[in-house]
């Protein structure tokens, strides 16, 4: 009997093959897990960059720009997503469902949600005659990595990520909003992770655009942004209809408690999301909190919701954790006009669901 045909060596060959196959599989699974982990986040803080941007603003902080909204705030529970439900159904004929980022472009989703919610509220309150289109997140992402930082086309780099100050600068000072529609030679009707990656390198509009899409974006600026640094300011902003794009390193668990809150997690997140509603301990919500809308689709988190129509994919954050998130000083309230106090109709589209 030859050595190769000996049962002992046949078993060794089989075991070696099994081990090799297992190693290849584990390497593949690890690579996929790493890719998914990277694509879930994308906030890369640049404190110096944000400070430089804030120096460009006459009223950089919400305490200044939103003094009227803070002074007149009543501390009422406010649910801005209800305006979005109505506006989205009017524009698209279907319910609003939170999207899912495909690369580390969370900055564009956090600020995109903020701009969309603000526009829906303007429509609901009669400031706009037509229900708004959704912003194209790829444009915000590219603009935040290139034009928003004063860089030339093709200098964004291939790594993922951006920061709040760059997105705020792009939307309010050097660019603006491009909508989900065919525009400027691009069909932006649906989100494309590949387009986001390309535009993150080349800038808004991609390779060879040479500023054409920038000119279109400038027609629709998010006129006012202001730095928000604490719970009270954020709650006052939301009460007047101004969402807050929140950039932080605070992570969360993936199950909500009985009141719809998610507990702060052990592992940090470099992530941007959006605060879109508020509740107060002396109101029907019975706890101070802000509702945080994520960009991982509707099913990443489970557990009870409050109110019952709370958006899937969102969770409430308690006051202490909100303050920790905003302490990074890279989170911005957004508005298409100003930050004046608005006495919104809380008995209709902002009332508590039955």
Enumerate the language-model features and the residues they cover.
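N-terminal Sec-pathway targeting helices
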Residues: 6-17
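Predominantly the structural core of cysteine protease catalytic domains
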Residues: 34-40, 108, 112-116, 146-293, ...
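Acidic helix-start/capping segments at beta-turn-to-alpha-helix junctions
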Residues: 128-150
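Intrinsically disordered/low-complexity terminal segments and short unstructured peptides
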Residues: 20, 49, 77, 136, ...
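Structured alpha-helical subdomains that flank or immediately precede key functional sites
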Residues: 15-16, 27-132, 156-180, 329, ...
